[in-house]
Amino acid sequence: MPDFGLYAYDGWRPTWPAAFIEWPDFGLPTDTDQATRLIVDAFDRAKSGQLVEVGCHAGNGRTGSIIACMVILAGIAPTDAIEWTREHYCWHAIDTKEQERWVEGFAPEPR
């Protein structure tokens, strides 16, 4: 069982602590600042050793976008992060060009 879940789909009903990003299918987060904060928080949890689950409805576009953002937080360049996510997670992760551009522009405040 995960220690924490970050979901871009409100249909999930986990029994563990979780956060939800309002993010329409094939679209972008409705609140970029909130999405960025939640992605950074989930990354920090994973980095500290917690088991973090990331998900959406199908597990491709939104989930892939979140994973690619976490790869960026790990120090990989945005374009390389998209490629890495498709190679290591799912070849069709990040559904749309709009989502690709969002990931490429992912830039949380320096910590």
Residue positions per predicted region:
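Charged phosphate-binding loop/patch that engages nucleotide di/tri-phosphates or the phosphate backbone
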Residues: D95-R111
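Cysteine-based protein phosphatase catalytic domain of the PTP/DSP
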Residues: M1-L51, I72-A74, P78-Q99
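A phosphate-binding catalytic loop at a beta-strand-loop-alpha-helix junction
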Residues: Q50-I72
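A compact, surface-exposed functional segment
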Residues: M70-G75, A107-E109
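A generic structural micro-environment signature
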Residues: G27-P29, I66, E109
